[in-house]
Amino acid sequence: MNFNSLRKEIFSNNASVKELVNDIFTNIDHKDPEINSYICTTKDNAIAQAENIDKLIQFKEKLPPLAGMPIAIKDNICTKGVATTCASKMLKNFVAPYESTASSKLWSSGGICLGKTNLDEFAMGSSTETSLFGVTSNPWDINRVPGGSSGGSAASVAAGFCAAAIGSDTGGSIRQPASFCGVVGLKPTYGRVSRWGLVAFASSLDQIGPITNTVSDAAEILYSISGKDPFDSTCLDKPVPNYLTHLNKSIKGLKIGIIKECFEHPGLNPEVKESVLSGVDRFQALGAEIIEVECPRFNDGIATYYVIAPSEASANLARYDGVKYGYRSNDGSNLIDMTSKSRAEGFGDEVQRRILIGTYALSAGYSDAYYKKAQKVRTLIRKDFDNAFNKVDVLLTPTCPTTAFLKGDFVNDPLSMYLSDLLTVPANLAGLPAISIPCGFDTKGLPIGMQLIGNVLEEDRILNAANIFEIDAQVIKNRPSF
């Protein structure tokens, strides 16, 4: 299911928008219990939105750009009047009193909200196994994880439960599940899309972006949700190009940098390496110039990230104290006791682990050794990228070291789980745009993702390269059956 196929259905009078939306909900009702991609659906609201679009079509009114396109929203993004739980007991009953800027722009552009998708609690995870609402399954193999933290969004797109979904990416949470589920996942430049209404995890790293079946659909959504926002001081006041106009440009002469350190890492699965290198050969055949580059501190990104992100999380999550909103424990003889028990009962194990790591890294006597040093390494990682982009236009890596792993494989081994973000976190630390696209399958039939990283605000360039590759390679010929 993609935007072009849906538009053909609608404008050939084969089906009304309302009929298409009803069909999707029927599919969700029958099949999503096996996948568990949605936390909740918003059928009544979606039908009302669909009827409005049908009226515009009937009376030949001008249609907004995303008219009738069914979209799901990750459940850490606020949607007015609908529960925004972050898959946590802490926010299980929280109903957002306002709409996020990104989702508001989608609905203004004619998109239809199908519901809220599952995630790792507070977006802290790489498998969508830490959700209060249960584990999400990978549509390609329901015994495996879809990745995380935007696993529900990626799984819903791959399974055909929506045409597109919105996720958030702090260290790879859009791109990693996109790779595991065989779909397209785009993390924009930091500040390209407003974070207003995104529940904060690590504020200097978080970014909202699309998960779709095609690169062109990702380009459409990015165009709709980008732009300056007075509610977010970190949102960039820069012109937003129409990304669709750049998609089909020739990539002859495009300089693609292959990051040496990524392909030499001992944790890289041989099948993943082989598939991505085949993708490199395809780019070369399409006219791109392939250049090996070095980013000496690229592999230091994971250690740097797991100091900075938990540190910011420990500060951001301090607001959940059981007083103003969120879960409140009924036990406790005084305020301190009540707050302590509310947080202990309201947060899951992984969230508590990261809060403790962050609090330790920021504590007196340790912040110089850990947090400040991590910030210095972050600057060096960005300098490595700057040096690389002096030589090339786009950087290329595998998205993940492996394909989707079995449920439960790393539940008791968080360090191994963290390593699944090895190749994605550097782009977040540097604030750069990056996209994951399918490039092949392993011998188990599981999708493999390839990552393209661009310079600041050069989403048009990575979207162009990704689109040319997608059209030529035709990797995903059939969607998973389950």
UniProtKB/Swiss-Prot annotation:
Molecular function terms from GO: ATP binding; glutaminyl-tRNA synthase (glutamine-hydrolyzing) activity
TM helices/strands, residue ranges: none
Active site per database record: K74 (charge relay system), S149 (charge relay system), S173 (acyl-ester intermediate)
GO biological processes: translation
Record keywords: ATP-binding, Ligase, Nucleotide-binding, Protein biosynthesis
Gene3D superfamilies from the UniProt entry: Amidase signature (AS) domain (3.90.1300.10)
The family this protein is said to belong to: Belongs to the amidase family. GatA subfamily.
Protein name as catalogued: Glutamyl-tRNA(Gln) amidotransferase subunit A
